[in-house]
Amino acid sequence: MESIYYVLCWHCHRRCKHCYESRFRPYIRDELEAVVAEAETNFPNIIANLPERMTFLEENPDSSKSEDYIEKTGKIILSGGDVLTEPVRERILYPVLEALQEKYRDNGGIKVVVQTTGDLLTPKIIDELLSRNIWS
């Protein structure tokens, strides 16, 4: 499998006019806790049901034999709303990143991409993401 797009949580700090999903919006108080708790409850089951290997075969461009293939590492794109919002980042994103690395460590590896608006990025968050092996 070359890639999977996984929406972690509906919460987003913005209300973009171009957004295709009405559930990507700001949530507050009890609503925020409910959408975060739902994502927190669901992610272990979602990860457990992902393919055992996230690899795919691609033709070897350096070979003249049509049956020569290279095994390549697939990727999972984590998105939301915005996965860098609080409390999504700490309660869902970071545990999901760690669980994905654990699941695929000995099964061909994984490239993990974090999709975000980017306006919540700080040097500290960038370091935290890189320490959890996001693909950059």
Could you say what each language-model-derived stretch is?
Residues 1-7, 11-79, 86-111, 123-124:
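Conserved alpha-helical substructure of the radical SAM core
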Residues 81-83, 117-119:
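Active-site beta-loop-alpha junctions enriched in small/polar residues
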Residues 114:
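Conserved, mostly hydrophobic/aromatic
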